[in-house]
């Protein structure tokens, strides 16, 4: 059994904001609060980055229209003692998905973590 770092992308809707910086701040704060309420404080929440289609430069993953924003968040956690990367993905989606109901989640990266010590079962 191995440990895996699983990164997921979440689409977070924020209402009544006037700019993308505010939207990102609200999205990160709300997601963090919902995760912490479920004792998932080990999940790291960051604003996502998307590439400019013209130049490839990284831009904040936030789209704002009519004072409503769709913010892309990156959620990252370490899954201990998983049988495979697919197993780690299922565990991560189950843990985070339970706390963030009605929030679309997609696994974007899974890395086997050889540095973290395996927890005893």
Swiss-Prot record:
Q: Taxonomic lineage per UniProt?
A: Archaea, Methanobacteriati, Methanobacteriota, Stenosarchaea group, Halobacteria
InterPro entries hit by this protein: UPF0212 (IPR007564)
Q: Which domain of life is it from?
A: Archaea
Similarity annotation: Belongs to the UPF0212 family.
Q: What is this protein called?
A: UPF0212 protein VNG_0879C
């Amino acid at each position: 059994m191995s440990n895996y770092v699983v990164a997921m992308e979440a689409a977070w809707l924020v209402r009544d904001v006037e700019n993308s910086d505010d939207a990102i701040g609200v999205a990160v704060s709300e997601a963090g609060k919902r995760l912490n309420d479920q004792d998932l404080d080990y999940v790291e929440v960051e604003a996502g980055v998307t590439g400019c289609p013209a130049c490839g430069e990284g831009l904040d993953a936030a789209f704002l229209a009519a004072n409503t924003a769709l913010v892309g968040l990156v959620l990252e956690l370490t899954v201990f003692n998983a049988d495979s990367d697919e197993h780690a993905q299922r565990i991560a989606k189950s843990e985070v998905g339970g706390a963030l109901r009605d929030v679309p989640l997609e696994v974007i990266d899974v890395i086997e973590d050889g540095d973290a010590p395996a927890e005893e079962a």
